[in-house]
Amino acid sequence: MYKSPLTLLTLLTICFGFFDLSSALYGSSSPVVQLTASNFKSKVLNSNGVVLVEFFAPWCGHCKALTPTWEKVANILKGVATVAAIDADAHQSAAQDYGIKGFPTIKVFVPGKAPIDYQGARDAKSIANFAYKQIKGLLSDRLEGKSKPTGGGSKEKKSEPSASVELNASNFDDLVIESNELWIVEFFAPWCGHCKKLAPEWKRAAKNLQGKVKLGHVNCDVEQSIMSRFKVQGFPTILVFGPDKSSPYPYEGARSASAIESFASELVESSAGPVEVTELTGPDVMEKKCGSAAICFISFLPDILDSKAEGRNKYLEMLLSVAEKFKKQPYSFMWVAAVTQMDLEKRVNVGGYGYPAMVAMNVKKGVYAPLKSAFELQHLLEFVKDAGTGGKGNVPMNGTPEIVKTKEWDGKDGELIEEDEFSLDELMGGDDAVGSKDEL
């Protein structure tokens, strides 16, 4: 069958045009920086400034629609921030490192922090405004001395802690997750100034804690899958892997060898001692039990006239069971009788839905999370476990609660205070008095 040369030429043009479009969305003259798996580290991770990265697929319709907008953003931010793009089809390893599931995905890389997902509107103004906020935050951190330029280029740590175990994707589960030992793990980035400052302290702590507590470190530039797995958001992050290895919690103490050693030693000692649920009887008790605890769990128990001693003791036995389950975690458990600490109840919104109730508090951060299910053993265990992973949603306390001094419970049933009866006539002065007043 005869085919017109023009028709064949048209078909070839369409085919080759299609393959050309599928190879890339941004040409050599585009203001958007072209990324590959080989230059990603130098262009993005080692950058001293904010970098916006679009992960795209050439066949993706939404990616094609975003192309002119992304180039407009690149022109707007020229000289202020880097706007880049990477073909996730051609460079799948880079996409896998950041858990890319759909296209286009936009991530913003800020020095010293984990990448941030951009989930706003896909117009140039919205994207540029979001970038501006990140740039402003970076400048603010540098002015306050929290972040410093890296000088361009990622450098490996000159001296790895000799007693700290180097952890990676191939050995992390075997050494940490499957272990019965306590592990304290530092997640760092080689270019991070705060990480470099911590390095000698970490080395000293690891050496002094040998045989007592395991210390390890993860290079997040290399082991990004581990970083994502434990939701590491900044560097350095120190996580404590206690008995429940699936729910590590952050170390929030000072970044000195002595502080880390003291924390680890106290953790080991507390795991061996008896558990306790302390009655909150004043500000000194609050400071002692909640001041240094990662999470402070406070239970608000019914008035003794409502539960009697037998009922209250049952609640306390239940709380002791919960405390025993989490004895190796840096938690504290306290209880307080209903309406004895009114300012605390007000700030954590307890009382309106009855007693008993429980809240998880982080005093340092000034936040809390309420127990929303029944005050029963299984629900309490689940609540404490979830609170340890940040899965309960924190609510601000809006200020430090005022704790008042109260008497410690004597372990007995309460006594109903009977009030003296009075006569309405006596209150009003009696009939004679009323009559006399009327006569006047």
Swiss-Prot record:
Motif Prevents secretion from ER: residue span?
Answer: 437-440
Record flagged with keyword Iron = no
* Tissues expressing this chain: Widely expressed.
Q: Which gene encodes it?
A: PDIL2-3
The active-site annotation reads 60, 63, 192, 195
Positions marked as site (Contributes to redox potential value):
61-62, 193-194
Q: Which is a GO BP term held by this UniProt record?
A: response to endoplasmic reticulum stress
Query: Can you name this protein?
Result: Protein disulfide-isomerase 2-3
Record Pfam families: Thioredox_PDIA6_C, Thioredoxin
Disordered: annotated segments: 143-163
